[in-house]
């Protein structure tokens, strides 16, 4: 199955998987949530815990870490089953708010240069800050269902006021918005910009069906740090 992409975004530096130079960007905290349904991206926050959007709660879920390249193996590849999945207590399928879940791995991930947890943001980032949007993409020769590249781009964070004035931002609370400088339109485009990383900390994680035009809406992770820490403590 071949996915066809339409990419028309310019927001700082983007290392497109369809450019002449393909490379795997350094984002060792990203994990691929593999299932028989739509692809999803999660973030390793501890060696045995992954933070992900709650809408990624799918049957037969497997957590893939390390190298994702199909034809190139380097020994960092890991596939771990979830042993426990905890959705945020207030999450609802009928509303986009609180779209978070925690995945407890059956065993701790083996940390290496391509598998590393990332710290959580504990404060709100200032509007105008240039942050990195980190996600997964398909390489040019990948005709399969699953992404095989980590890709990064840069984009500025919007103010809360500007966010609430957008069509998407009106219906989201506890959110952070970023500005795509040109329209971003592609199949499974949310995978390529799945997380917001500011000052080397996880600031945002994508909300289901969050993109429209030139704005991306993300769950503001720092609003949920207390829940995350209490849930994962000593486990």
From Swiss-Prot:
Keywords: Cytoplasmic vesicle, Disulfide bond, Fertilization, Secreted, Signal. Residues 20-233 form the Peptidase S1 domain. GO terms for biological process: binding of sperm to zona pellucida; cell migration; germ cell migration; positive regulation of acrosome reaction; positive regulation of fertilization; protein maturation; proteolysis; regulation of protein processing. It is found in: Cytoplasmic vesicle, Secretory vesicle, Acrosome; Secreted. Gene3D superfamilies: Trypsin-like serine proteases (2.40.10.10). The keyword Signal applies. Disulfide bonds join 40-56, 131-198, 163-177. Residues 1-19 form the signal peptide. GO terms for cellular component: acrosomal vesicle; extracellular space. Plays a role in male fertility. May have a role in sperm migration or binding to zona-intact eggs. Involved in the activation of the proacrosin/acrosin system. Belongs to the peptidase S1 family. PANTHER family: INACTIVE SERINE PROTEASE 37-RELATED (PTHR24271:SF61), KALLIKREIN-RELATED (PTHR24271). This is Probable inactive serine protease 37. It comes from Bos taurus.
């Amino acid at each position: 199955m071949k996915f066809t992409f339409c990419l028309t975004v310019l927001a700082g530096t983007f290392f497109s998987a369809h450019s002449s130079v393909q490379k795997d960007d350094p984002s060792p905290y990203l994990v691929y949530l593999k299932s028989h349904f739509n692809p999803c991206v999660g973030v390793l926050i501890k060696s045995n815990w992954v933070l992900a959007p709650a809408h990624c709660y799918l049957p037969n879920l497997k957590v893939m870490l390390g190298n994702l390249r199909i034809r190139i193996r380097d020994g960092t590849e890991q596939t771990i089953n979830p042993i426990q999945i905890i959705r945020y207590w207030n999450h609802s399928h009928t509303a986009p708010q609180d779209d978070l879940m925690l995945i407890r791995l059956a065993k701790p991930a083996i940390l290496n240069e391509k598998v590393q947890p990332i710290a959580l943001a504990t404060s709100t980032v200032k509007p105008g800050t240039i942050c990195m949007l980190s996600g997964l993409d398909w390489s040019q020769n990948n005709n399969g269902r699953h992404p095989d590249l980590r890709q990064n781009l840069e984009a500025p964070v919007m103010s809360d006021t500007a966010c609430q004035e957008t069509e998407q931002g009106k219906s989201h609370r506890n959110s952070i918005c970023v500005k795509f400088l040109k329209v971003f339109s592609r199949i499974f485009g949310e995978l390529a910009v799945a997380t917001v990383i500011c000052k080397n900390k996880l600031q945002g994680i994508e909300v289901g069906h969050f993109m429209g035009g030139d704005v991306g809406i993300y769950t503001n992770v720092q609003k949920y740090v207390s829940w995350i820490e209490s849930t994962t403590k000593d486990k």
